[in-house]
Amino acid sequence: MQKLINSVQNYAWGSKTALTELYGIANPQQQPMAELWMGAHPKSSSRITTANGETVSLRDAIEKNKTAMLGEAVANRFGELPFLFKVLCAAQPLSIQVHPNKRNSEIGFAKENAAGIPMDAAERNYKDPNHKPELVFALTPFLAMNAFREFSDIVSLLQPVAGAHSAIAHFLQVPNAERLSQLFASLLNMQGEEKSRALAVLKAALNSQQGEPWQTIRVISEYYPDDSGLFSPLLLNVVKLNPGEAMFLFAETPHAYLQGVALEVMANSDNVLRAGLTPKYIDIPELVANVKFEPKPAGELLTAPVKSGAELDFPIPVDDFAFSLHDLALQETSIGQHSAAILFCVEGEAVLRKDEQRLVLKPGESAFIGADESPVNASGTGRLARVYNKL
């Protein structure tokens, strides 16, 4: 088991203070520190220190010894560490995104390769043939949007802005999935005078409407005053996660992170179709083809964890990763899995022991446990988060 040396991604939407306040990570240049990455992603792999004191990339170390480090089932199925674990610190809204399902990712990736679209081209949608399921676990109060509201809810919220666009009136007449799809595309397609008029109607409604989701629209409009994505809180569930609550983000479901600090776990993929709140390229036909226009009640969005002793397991409907929390005590408990694991100290102090080796993790620190090192004993105070595979 090795302590991970992790990198910070300095995206513009990141908080300049959260990682310092929570975990003491220095920020002398006062840059936005958006994400702390833990894993073996080719873009920015964590590093480990070998027995002879050399620092190497975790990705390279796994590549040399896949079966021992990943476990046979994961090595055969995925051929690499199949997840990326992050601390995400949003000071301002991220773009609304949709992740294609596995089959569409494979088809889209092959199609764009055949068309010769460069990987770094603005119009490139598919960077790899994988899907991108995600779990987000709140460390602070965390504001997000996820999945379409129930149609009756959308109807009542759209009434004050019915005059903003003909597609809104069209949906209000017959609120069904087909017309929601047309409305979604129409709002994203708005240009020039049509867009200015629609946003003026929305902003006028803000003066008379109180509470949610109008307050969320006000927050977003500070950063994206001229973006048609400002209509999205009327269509999507606005979710406020309390610390300790989590939700899973399914493929083909629009979602956005708006504000707060969370742990995020995802499959190793960069496939993103944008759907607003962004200056970047939006491929509207491809987006609409990859969205399920079906309602999901807000009450069904939270993941219900299963408690077993000191472990809290968050059920995940895919094999790419599993996520659990462990309450630590002075008495050692065994933590084991048939795969690699990344253990992250959420709070307190964790002591990990394997035979004669002992590793201490302070808040914000993490360790990599190879499959061949499982199980390890854990003790201390506070909580550990564990990401692994149940294969």
From Swiss-Prot:
GO terms for cellular component: cytosol. It catalyses: D-mannose 6-phosphate = D-fructose 6-phosphate. GO terms for biological process: carbohydrate metabolic process; GDP-mannose biosynthetic process. InterPro entries: Man6P_Isoase-1 (IPR001250), Mannose-6-P_Isomerase (IPR016305), MPI_cupin_dom (IPR049071), Pmannose_isomerase-type1_CS (IPR018050), PMI_typeI_cat (IPR046457), PMI_typeI_hel (IPR046458), RmlC-like_jellyroll (IPR014710), RmlC_Cupin_sf (IPR011051). Binds 1 zinc ion per subunit. Its EC number is 5.3.1.8. It is an enzyme of class 5 (isomerase). The keyword Cell inner membrane does not apply. It is found in: Cytoplasm. Disulfide bonds: none annotated. Zn(2+) binds at residues 97, 99, 134, 255. Keywords: Cytoplasm, Isomerase, Metal-binding, Zinc. Its main location: cytoplasm. The active site is at residue 274. Involved in the conversion of glucose to GDP-L-fucose, which can be converted to L-fucose, a capsular polysaccharide. Belongs to the mannose-6-phosphate isomerase type 1 family. PANTHER family: MANNOSE-6-PHOSPHATE ISOMERASE. This is Mannose-6-phosphate isomerase. It comes from Salmonella typhimurium (strain LT2 / SGSC1412 / ATCC 700720). The lineage of its organism: Bacteria, Pseudomonadati, Pseudomonadota, Gammaproteobacteria, Enterobacterales. The gene is manA.
